[in-house]
């Protein structure tokens, strides 16, 4: 079983809690990320997602006056790097979250998304299918070879009878 440390993204985009919502949206767009980990004094104080920013606008807030601290999720669900992917997937499903920071000794090491886990599982499933197809091919070739030997024996036997 894989651990989160094996597939986590190590480049985490962080932001100060006072960052205005429009600046956060620009940062997410520029960095091509769906969330920012909000840090206060080198500690995680929250996480804000693109959906949180959309909700802020949809609720009619004056986004020029809103900071991300007003719309972030806190406290943050986080896990250590040795957490098994399957266990993290269960936590994410139970908590209904899509992104989880990876923390060790209070230090932010990375972040992992549900799609990272799904992509990795797709790779694992593809590998299993590949192995299975190879096994089927070997088994089929072996079975054809055995049938061929039987057919040859039957023909030789038949040939002896007719001569």
Where do the language-model regions lie?
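The conserved cystathionine-beta-synthase
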Residues: 14-32, 79-96, 103, 121
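Short hydrophobic/aromatic-rich motifs at helix boundaries and adjacent loops
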Residues: 7, 23-26, 39-41, 59-62
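A glycine-centered beta-loop-beta connector
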Residues: 28-31, 36-51, 92, 100-115
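Tandem CBS (Bateman) regulatory domains
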Residues: 1-11, 49-78, 84-93, 113-163
């Amino acid at each position: 079983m894989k651990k989160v440390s094996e597939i986590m993204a190590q480049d985490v985009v962080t932001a100060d809690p006072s960052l205005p919502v429009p600046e956060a949206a620009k940062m997410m767009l520029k960095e091509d990320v769906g969330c920012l980990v909000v840090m206060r004094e080198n500690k995680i104080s929250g996480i804000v997602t693109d959906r949180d920013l959309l909700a802020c606008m949809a609720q009619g807030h004056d986004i020029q006056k809103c900071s991300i601290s007003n719309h972030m999720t806190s406290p943050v669900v986080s896990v250590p790097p040795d957490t098994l992917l399957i266990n993290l997937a269960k936590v994410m499903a139970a908590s209904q979250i899509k992104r989880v920071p990876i923390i060790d000794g209070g230090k932010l090491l990375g972040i992992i998304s549900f799609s990272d886990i799904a992509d990795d599982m797709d790779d694992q499933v593809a590998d299993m299918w590949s192995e299975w197809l190879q096994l089927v091919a070997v088994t089929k070739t072996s079975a054809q070879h055995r049938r061929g030997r039987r057919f040859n024996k039957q023909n030789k036997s038949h040939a002896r009878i007719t001569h």
